[in-house]
Amino acid sequence: MVKRHKNTIGVWRLGKTLGTGSTSCVRLAKHAKTGDLAAIKIIPIRYASIGMEILMMRLLRHPNILRLYDVWTDHQHMYLALEYVPDGELFHYIRKHGPLSEREAAHYLSQILDAVAHCHRFRFRHRDLKLENILIKVNEQQIKIADFGMATVEPNDSCLENYCGSLHYLAPEIVSHKPYRGAPADVWSCGVILYSLLSNKLPFGGQNTDVIYNKIRHGAYDLPSSISSAAQDLLHRMLDVNPSTRITIPEVFSHPFLMGCTSLSSMDSTTPPTPSLSIDEIDPLVVDCMCVLWKKSSSKKVVRRLQQRDDNDEKYVYKVLSEILRDDMLKKQRFDENKYLSLYDLIHDNNLFTKASISTTSLVKSNVSTNSRKSSNFEDELARRVSSPLSALNQMSQSPIPIRVSSDKDYDSYACHEVVSNPSTLDDDYNYMFVCPPEEYTYSTDNVRTDSLDLQSLPTPTLEQLESVPFNRYGYVRIFPSTTLSSTASGYYTPDSLSTPEPSIDGLTNLDDVQVGGFVQGSGNQNRRPISFPVISNMQPNITNVRSASAPLCSSPVPSRRYSQYATNARYTPRKVSSGSVLRKISSFFRKD
């Protein structure tokens, strides 16, 4: 039997707090049966719309990419069970130990680039690579790339126009607000990371943001005299202001700096060429998933690429995706099919990729299901979803209610929600959930109906039953693998921070953190690490926040994913701050010209 208490999220028992950000916190957790450790990232639902992030982390199986174990939710928070890396961020490691030797820096850089290349072969662009988003296992000398919150899928025939990232790691084309390709931008960020590993400071610093922007645009930085000529040459090529002439990841692996310092001389040593496939060997199910994942790709083009003798991304992704789907289907057989959301189902979730407007909304009433079914489109869509494993929660409830939290007060009380008349046209910038909690767990209002699921009428279900049933007695719902999430297709705003002008890593001071209403504030010396600057107009910036420096860089037509209650606004007006401050310079940069 599994003893459960209020500090249990599904099959995970919560422990100490590992870290706190502007909108989330991370707690250590232990699996109730196996004893395995995990880091539970807790995000309020009003800030969480992370379907694309979950999809990427399920697809990207790589030794240098952080693993996603599990996802749970209740009516207040999302709980992501991630791989636990006890030694923490690479940022803290460099801050503690100072500059690394060239051999050690090359060893870690090769792991970072190998993981980034793995992402790029899926056409995923991370767009927020930095020391704070890289975790390290010191004893194993292994790194893990984390936080795919700003990652996106980049079609081959188009550029990205969503400008986001961390100030000191931004590529010149992003700072200049030009349409850009994600792969060269990631290479630039890796160049900044290499510079930091070798010198214990960031290459682009200054007294204000204007100075930093100008240095980035012109590629103006000072190279430490202590590093070798091979390292200097690689830095010059990675920090090339022209993305078309910037070195690529395969070229980096062939560079003398990496070849002389590591045994990994090329990407071919870790990703051997994939043989061509005949038309009889090609699985149309896998090809279909590739076309949906890559949006504009045609099946004929993918099949032609799979039949070529030369190695290409299509052959690589086909091989990896077919293995994942096969393993996923084996797992699905151990679960009730109606309660397991396979990777195939997640890829084919229309809400994950489709952007459309909501046609009709109304307040939730006790008879909302009957009223909603007056729409034939809604009834047809509901019948389709009930016959599909896409929404396990729908099948378990007599009348599922797709809702969206419309404001903070509504989020707190669930007194007012909006009903979607046609789920097939859900805007993926909203955070939709299907409300059907078990009967022993009720909300504080009568407007939301409860479901009759009772965990097989057992007062203390076993762990196996907990893993196959998405509810537990405290109202937590397992959504991975159980039901689906909505997300944006081209990245989103994050409430993390922009960087302060201080370029030094070694000179950062410790901060005595005090937990105040879910936000971290300093009670001691002013922290010189990157600060938070939320761009939502009614959010208060926290100048002593110790989380990483991620933020959008301008008004963007893509609404917020984490700030889903503001998603109806096409653009954001930054909050005005005092004249002459760094925050005002940042806010002026956000304004559209």
UniProtKB/Swiss-Prot annotation:
**SUPFAM superfamilies the record matches:** Protein kinase-like (PK-like)
Annotated gene: cdr1
User: What are its GO cellular component terms?
Assistant: Cdr2 medial cortical node complex; cell division site; cytoplasm; cytosol; medial cortical node; nucleus
Q: Which SMART domains match?
A: S_TKc
Catalysed conversion reaction: L-seryl-[protein] + ATP = O-phospho-L-seryl-[protein] + ADP + H(+); L-threonyl-[protein] + ATP = O-phospho-L-threonyl-[protein] + ADP + H(+)
Residue positions binding ATP: 18-26, 41
Family statement drawn from the similarity comment of this UniProt entry: Belongs to the protein kinase superfamily. CAMK Ser/Thr protein kinase family. NIM1 subfamily.
Question: Residue ranges of the Protein kinase domain?
Answer: 12-258
Record has Cell cycle as a keyword? yes
Q: Which InterPro entries match?
A: Kinase-like_dom_sf (IPR011009), Prot_kinase_dom (IPR000719), Protein_kinase_ATP_BS (IPR017441), Ser/Thr_kinase_AS (IPR008271)
**Assigned keywords, A-Z:** ATP-binding, Cell cycle, Cell division, Kinase, Mitosis, Nucleotide-binding, Phosphoprotein, Serine/threonine-protein kinase, Transferase
Q: What is this protein called?
A: Mitosis inducer protein kinase cdr1
Active-site positions, per UniProt?
128
E.C. number: 2.7.11.1
Q: Which domain of life is it from?
A: Eukaryota
Keyword Nucleotide-binding listed? The answer is yes
Q: How does it assemble?
A: Interacts with msp1.
